[in-house]
Amino acid sequence: ATLTSKTSTVDTFKANSGVFPFTTDSKSFALRLDHRATDSHQLFLRYNYTLSDDENENTRALVGFTRSTNTHILDSGVVGGWTFAASPNLINETRLQWNYRNFFVRPNEPNGPELNISGYGFFNRDIFLPSLSIERRYEIAEALSYSRAQHRFKFGMNLLLRGNNSD
């Protein structure tokens, strides 16, 4: 069969035929430090880092190369804590946390327009892309525990602040 459409349409079909590479690159790092300053003071600090890049991960069957995407994820976070035992019956715990995450999804075809042909294929930029999200998270937690005989009382608070900027 011969395609009789405009040259640009025929070129789109040719560019979206065949086998396309799928590459992924992921790096992760974590570090935790624990310190017992005294019998009543214990500290910890943990840092996590992940960087991940994927290309053409959704190219398959009817999804053409021009519709496929490239994703970039960066996730970085720190959490620290302090436990203070004022007495065997009275313990105070404090935790602080910070996290930054970006999740970027970019199309291979940045200009569009979206072209969907049922039963044949999906081409060009998805209507909802690119998607660029940045999330930030801050958390403070405080807990005071008191034990007496068979009873245990726990008081505390948790403050969580989150922000999400999506384009």
What are these regions (language model features)?
Residues 1-167:
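Short acidic-glycine motifs
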